[in-house]
A protein has these predicted regions:
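Perimembrane helix-loop-helix junctions
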Residues: 5, 235-268, 296
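Hydrophobic, aromatic-rich transmembrane alpha-helices
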Residues: 34-37, 338, 348, 352-400, ...
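Transmembrane-helix motifs of polytopic, lipid-linked glycan transferases
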Residues: 122-154, 198, 202
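Signature aromatic-anchored transmembrane alpha helix within multi-pass, membrane-resident enzymes
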Residues: 159-166, 264-272, 401-411, 415, ...
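Start-transfer (signal-anchor) and selected internal transmembrane alpha helices
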Residues: 1-61, 153-165, 258-266, 404, ...
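Transmembrane-helix signature of polytopic, membrane-embedded enzymes
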Residues: 140-174, 194, 209-217, 408, ...
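Membrane-interface transmembrane helices that cradle and orient dolichyl/undecaprenyl
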Residues: 191, 196-215, 249-250
């Protein structure tokens, strides 16, 4: 049985991802090993520093929250000890309930059952980030496989250079790295990213071979992701719509109906699972924020709620969040005895219609600062799809256009996960991870279009690769150094 399962995934999963390209296989394995080693080293350093600080206990920054929640689940409850919630209690019937999902708790079950481990948020964050980075690298490979099925590239050497730059940006430059801090807050976001990327990966593989199991894996991934971080449910909804759109064109009625139903399931079951957990915890489909202990007790939050008409989400926060998450000057390179980077302290931007002090800001970096190569690829992606689309269509037939449209729709679906952080009352560096799926797909597809349609020009072949290499290496450096800096001030 194991042999048949292994043979199945070899023929239908890895074949789609790598498509027999030895260079891509070797590059992905090497960068995967390098990036996971760096993640492990960074987190080990962060964990040791936090654990050795005086006055830090196992409940600090929700480090023990998910283990505590699992112990409650095993006893048929969903409440947690108030000290484990670390000031994040929703007080209902004199019991403390946390708003964080149950996936990170359930993922601890095998380790608790086998090794009897308790309170190990620190180790789980390593696992979540390794899954995130490796899944991101596989998404890059699968996108290249789908694209190269239809198009030849500008030249072998340039194509390999562009591919390596995207792999670097998907590993050492990945926004998931900004979740590399030993805390339950960061871990929940890291798992949300990991399962969102896995869901996208399985959808891409399904598109190539139309085998049902990969849509089932997509559904499972998004359910787990949604119960780690709600933004994953938004991505799942739009990915499900894309699957439905593809399924409608299937010539076989039985397969069309099957994939249509699975697409509906992907769109709605993840969000329904969140609503169910909320109902079991709070007795309502959406938690009342005025039951949160900090809203009535903390003057800071009381003032914010008063200024915004007691809202925690809304378009009133959109303009301020857009500026904060995309401003290009959010990182300072501070040269002292050791070169390090830090987010600017003056990045708080209360922009109309938001009133001053009407939002919660932490010191945060931005997408354009951390991934400058993304800015270039975003411009390429938009330009080729808006300005040059008519010229592009002359070079492709209907089958190829269908593949390109699918890839574009997947980009739009992955971009849906940024909606929640953009309309949320709080702005934090860890929320940058929510932008990760959209950044990864736009960066990869932009690079493919760049490789095909930009590097055909002799002038661009001489200048643009140098610019991209500089941007990529600079972004990877900023990403890693910012994690190190934030860890030291954590």
């Amino acid at each position: 049985m194991l042999k048949s399962i292994s043979s199945f995934f070899k023929n239908h999963f890895f074949l789609v991802i790598f498509a027999g390209d030895k260079f891509r296989i070797k590059s992905t394995i090497i960068l995967g090993m390098l990036s996971t080693s760096i993640i492990t080293f960074l987190l080990h350093e962060q964990i040791q520093r936090v654990s050795s600080r005086p006055g830090i206990d196992e409940n600090w920054m929700l480090r023990n929250y998910f283990t505590n929640q699992l112990n409650s689940i095993l006893n048929g409850r969903l409440d947690v000890e108030s000290n484990a919630a670390w000031g994040e209690c929703f007080n209902i019937n004199e019991l403390c309930y946390g708003y964080h999902g149950i996936t990170p708790s359930l993922l601890r079950l095998p380790l608790i059952a086998v090794f009897k481990w308790q309170g190990f948020t620190d180790q789980m964050i390593v696992f979540s980030l390794v899954v995130s980075i490796l899944s991101s690298l596989l998404v890059v490979n699968s996108l290249w496989t789908i694209f190269h099925k239809n198009f030849t590239v500008s030249s072998r050497n340039y194509s390999r250079t562009i591919f390596l730059l995207v792999l670097l940006s998907a590993s050492l430059g990945n926004l998931a790295m900004q979740a590399a801090l030993p805390s339950g807050y960061w871990e929940a976001i890291a798992w949300g990213y990991a399962f969102s990327i896995l869901g996208i990966l399985f959808t891409l593989v399904w598109y190539c071979n139309r085998i049902k199991i990969f849509l089932v894996l997509t559904l499972i991934s998004f359910i787990l992701g949604a119960n780690s971080r709600m933004t994953s449910a938004i991505t799942a909804f739009f990915v499900g719509i894309v699957v439905i759109g593809v399924a409608r064109k299937h010539p076989n009625l039985k397969l069309r109906s099957r994939d249509f139903i699975l697409g509906l399931s992907i769109a709605f079951i993840p969000v329904l699972s969140i609503i169910l957990v909320f109902y079991l915890k709070f007795g309502t489909f959406l938690p009342d924020y005025f039951l949160h202990q900090q809203i009535p007790e903390n003057p800071f939050w009381a003032n914010i709620m008063n200024l915004n008409g007691n809202k925690t989400t809304g378009l009133i926060f959109l303009t301020s969040n857009i500026v904060a998450y995309f401003r290009p000057d959010s990182i300072i390179i501070d040269g002292t005895s050791v070169l390090f980077v830090r987010p600017t302290m003056d990045s708080y931007s209360y922009i109309w219609p938001l009133k001053k002090d009407g939002m919660y800001f932490e010191s945060s970096s931005s997408v354009s600062s951390l991934i400058p190569i993304f800015v270039v690829m975003f411009i390429v992606f938009v330009s080729l799809n808006v300005i040059w689309w008519k010229d592009l269509k002359r070079e492709i037939n209907q089958a190829i256009e269908s593949d390109l449209n699918f890839l574009k729709y997947m980009v739009f679906a992955s971009s849906a996960c940024i909606l929640l952080p953009l309309i949320y009352v709080g702005n934090s560096n860890r929320y940058l991870v929510d932008f990760g799926p959209a950044v990864l797909l736009i960066l990869t597809l932009g690079s493919l279009l760049f490789d095909k349609f930009i590097l055909n020009n002799k002038w661009s072949r001489k200048i643009l690769p140098t610019i991209l290499i500089t941007f990529c290496l600079y972004g990877c450096f900023l990403n890693l150094m910012l994690v190190r800096t934030l860890g030291r001030s954590f």
